A protein has these predicted regions:
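Terminal, charged accessory segments of proteins
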Residues: 1-137
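Catalytic core segments in nucleotide and nucleic-acid processing enzymes
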Residues: 134-256
Length: 256
């Protein structure tokens, strides 16, 4: 498997992005991953600011093990013959089996839990406990896309911000729509290496629905300003193509 576009962990092995901008340490890169993982895991769990800051100090495997533990109710390890029979529970057999297998498939203990509380824990286990091994790998381009999308929705509340899957569209009444493509790619200002993305932007403009296309990448030390792109074959059209740096620093600032 090619791990080039993935971040996360495979057992004790961590796949963190190369250091960039102010993300110059293992702790900051872990914190970045924990924050961005919320976009994919939002229906299962959420790492709050405190967890992001403190779990970043330990390996990602341990961080997710701690998160699973925090999602389980306090009575998770009660034996069948010791639990409070006067307390009512809605048992979820599938979730119970998942959690039992996660802790110890040979144990004689059985979990007596409230299914409403258990389901997130079981779902998280099913996402990151694969073949009896802790593992969670995510597409970094998807994570960056979701991060930019959330930022744009907060910034342009008076406009229509649409997630088109491979791109983002911003529409406003009586104004030509803007199309945005995101990519987690290290950009060097003198040699940005974005020919493929620019050619795609040219085709989008030629189709006529958009005259502005922005190519957004993570901000880095050598990529701090917009890079305008001029295209000879579009010189008689009104258009705008830009490569734009997008900062991820707010993730660190939020958790200080």
């Amino acid at each position: 498997m090619d791990f080039t576009n993935f971040v996360g962990f495979d057992g004790k092995k961590e796949l963190l992005p190369c250091g960039f901008d102010t993300f110059d340490s293992e702790v900051k890169l872990r914190q970045l991953f924990l924050h961005l993982s919320n976009f994919v895991l939002n229906s299962i769990c959420h790492f709050n600011k405190y967890e992001q800051k403190n779990f970043a100090k330990i390996p990602l495997k341990n961080a997710f093990e701690s998160k699973i533990k925090s999602l389980l109710p306090l009575h998770k390890l009660n034996r069948l013959n010791n639990f409070d029979k006067n307390r009512k529970f809605n048992l979820c057999s599938s979730s119970t089996r998942i959690i039992n297998n996660y802790y110890n498939p040979k144990t004689s203990q059985r979990l007596i839990v409230n299914s409403k509380k258990l389901i997130p824990a079981a779902k998280l286990i099913s996402h990151c406990f694969i073949n009896n091994k802790m593992q969670l790998l995510m597409d970094k381009n998807l994570l960056f896309h979701e991060f930019v999308l959330e930022k744009l929705r907060k910034l342009h509340k008076d406009k229509e911000v649409l997630d088109l899957g491979d791109s983002i569209s911003i529409k406003q009444k009586d104004v030509c729509a803007l199309k945005i493509y995101t990519s987690w790619k290290n950009i060097q200002r003198k040699d940005p290496n974005i020919e493929k993305e620019v050619n795609h932007a040219i085709n989008v403009i030629k189709e006529g629905d958009y005259n502005q296309v922005y190519l957004i990448y993570p901000k880095d030390n050598d990529f701090t300003r917009h890079i305008p792109v001029y295209v000879e074959e579009l010189k008689y059209k009104t258009y705008q193509i830009k490569a734009i740096p997008y900062s991820l620093r707010s993730i660190i600032r939020k958790n200080i």
